[in-house]
């Protein structure tokens, strides 16, 4: 993607003898207060749009330079009133261009690609699957794939490679054909699109308002360019908003028993088709004024 250019079958078993009734598995217990973690206001991006509010948790562990750029531009009001100029249904919604054509960017220099990151033993990471030679799980709310821990001992920095996975709600940075050409334009995933993995920098994930992302006006044409597009009306870090206007978000802690039960439930429901993208981490949002 350049700046201009993302049933289950039901089986019935007939028994020769009497039909044996099977009780449905009880739902997991409601999470306890300790099963939640608060997102810091300095890592919560508040995107108000003409269709409603989107809240994005930033992930500086994955892309520190890109997160710093998003914070800088938000603080300067750069994103206010910019269009969602490229929106493709079943793919993504793109914005951040002051020209509204796909050719614009901020006055700051382009960023070096942060397509992968280094994960050490001190980085908070919750695995949910372990395919051969890899671990798949979460850093904060962001789904990631990484090399296994046992490879850390053999690396110079005692860390292993990891990268964000483009599940619904994941926030990525748009760029031109060159790897180091991201600047101000970004996109939010409407659906999963794994072809983007390790090709575009992941810097966060929508934790509230995915329905808003999916409601943004989409283009009827393959290029995704939208006429009379929806707009971002204001973009700020929660920390930069007045206290009375500041939303707060509690995310289910991925280290909790409640989260493990949620993962088990998703795995049982999907069977062999289970993917980390099937896991929706619950959030409790206090909207603010």
Regions found by a protein language model. Name each.
Residues 21-289:
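Cyclophilin-like peptidyl-prolyl cis-trans isomerases
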Residues 1-7:
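Bacterial N-terminal signal peptides that target proteins for export
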Residues 7-17:
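Bacterial N-terminal signal peptides
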């Amino acid at each position: 993607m350049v700046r201009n250019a993302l049933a289950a079958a039901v089986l019935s078993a007939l028994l020769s003898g009497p039909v044996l009734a099977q009780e449905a598995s009880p739902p997991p217990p409601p999470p306890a207060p300790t099963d939640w973690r608060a997102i810091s206001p300095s890592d919560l991006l508040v995107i108000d749009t003409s269709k409603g509010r989107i809240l994005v948790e930033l992930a500086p562990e994955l892309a520190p330079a890109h997160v710093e750029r998003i914070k800088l531009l938000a603080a300067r009001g750069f994103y206010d009133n910019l269009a969602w100029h490229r929106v493709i249904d079943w793919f993504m919604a793109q914005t951040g261009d002051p020209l509204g054509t796909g050719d614009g960017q901020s006055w700051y220099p382009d960023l070096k690609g942060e397509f992968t990151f280094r994960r050490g033993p001190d980085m908070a990471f919750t695995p949910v699957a372990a395919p051969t030679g890899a671990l798949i799980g979460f850093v904060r709310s962001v789904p990631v794939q990484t090399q296994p821990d046992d490879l850390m001992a053999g690396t110079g920095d005692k860390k292993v490679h990891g990268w964000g996975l483009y599940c619904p709600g994941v926030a990525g940075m748009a760029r031109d054909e060159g790897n180091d050409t991201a600047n101000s334009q970004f996109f939010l995933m409407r659906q999963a699109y794994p072809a983007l993995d390790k090709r575009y920098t992941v810097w966060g994930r929508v934790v509230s308002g995915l329905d808003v992302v999916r409601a943004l006006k989409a283009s009827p044409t393959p290029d995704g360019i939208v006429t009379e597009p929806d707009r971002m009306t204001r973009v700020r870090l929660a920390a930069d908003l007045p206290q009375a206007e500041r939303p707060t978000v509690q995310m289910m802690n991925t280290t909790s028993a409640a989260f493990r039960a949620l993962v088990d439930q998703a795995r049982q429901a999907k069977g062999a088709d289970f993917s980390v993208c099937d896991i929706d981490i619950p959030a409790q949002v206090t909207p603010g004024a």
